[in-house]
């Protein structure tokens, strides 16, 4: 199997459980706090942590390229959902709640950066 076909297969295999987990997480939070965006927020922060960890392990050469594609790009890439995040921000703006949109955007970016940093730190130094 050619390298690019194998890489695509690894990403696809990793994406299946990541997308499934995202669906489960978002559906889990929705009945408890409707329209509060906690499901999207949670999966994006978890994905940032995981991708930071995988990146650090990959850069230290303790993770192989195939494993990084499977877990980093496939699983954590499909777990995170920037498009849903953007639509949720847009919906808050359209509903006349710019402050909610701003707080959600800033909190998501700050939490995502912190989570990626912690994941990277654990992978690089832990």
From Swiss-Prot:
Q: Supply the source organism's classification.
A: Bacteria, Bacillati, Cyanobacteriota, Cyanophyceae, Synechococcales
**What PANTHER family has UniProt attached to this entry?**
FLUORIDE EXPORT PROTEIN 1-RELATED (PTHR28259:SF1)
InterPro entries cross-referenced by the UniProt entry? FluC (IPR003691)
Return the similarity comment.
Belongs to the fluoride channel Fluc/FEX (TC 1.A.43) family.
Write down a Pfam family by its short name. Answer: CRCB
Membrane-spanning ranges: 1-21, 38-58, 67-87, 99-119
Give the UniProt subcellular location, in the record's own words. Cell inner membrane
| GO CC aspect terms | plasma membrane
In Swiss-Prot or TrEMBL terms, this protein is called Fluoride-specific ion channel FluC 1
Locate the residues binding Na(+): 77, 80
Span of the signal peptide: none
From which source organism is this entry?
A: Synechococcus sp. (strain CC9902)
Question: What is the topology of this protein in the membrane according to its UniProt annotation?
Answer: Multi-pass membrane protein
Q: Write out the GO MF terms.
A: fluoride channel activity; metal ion binding
Name one process (GO BP) from the record: cellular detoxification of fluoride
Keyword set, alphabetical order = Cell inner membrane, Cell membrane, Ion channel, Ion transport, Membrane, Metal-binding, Sodium, Transmembrane, Transmembrane helix, Transport
Q: What does this protein do?
A: Fluoride-specific ion channel. Important for reducing fluoride concentration in the cell, thus reducing its toxicity.
Reactions that this protein is recorded to catalyse: fluoride(in) = fluoride(out)
């Amino acid at each position: 199997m050619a390298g690019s076909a194998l890489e695509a297969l690894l990403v696809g295999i990793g994406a299946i459980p990541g997308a499934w987990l995202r669906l489960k997480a978002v559906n889990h939070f929705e009945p408890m706090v409707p329209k509060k965006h906690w499901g999207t927020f949670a999966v994006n922060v978890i994905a940032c942590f995981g991708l930071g960890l995988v990146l650090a392990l990959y850069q230290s050469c303790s993770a192989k390229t195939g494993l990084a594609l499977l877990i980093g790009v496939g699983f954590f890439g499909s777990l995170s959902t920037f498009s849903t995040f953007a639509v949720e921000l847009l919906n808050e703006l359209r509903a006349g709640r710019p402050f909610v949109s701003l707080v959600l955007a800033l909190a998501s970016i700050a939490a995502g950066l912190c989570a990626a940093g912690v994941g990277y730190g654990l992978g690089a130094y832990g």
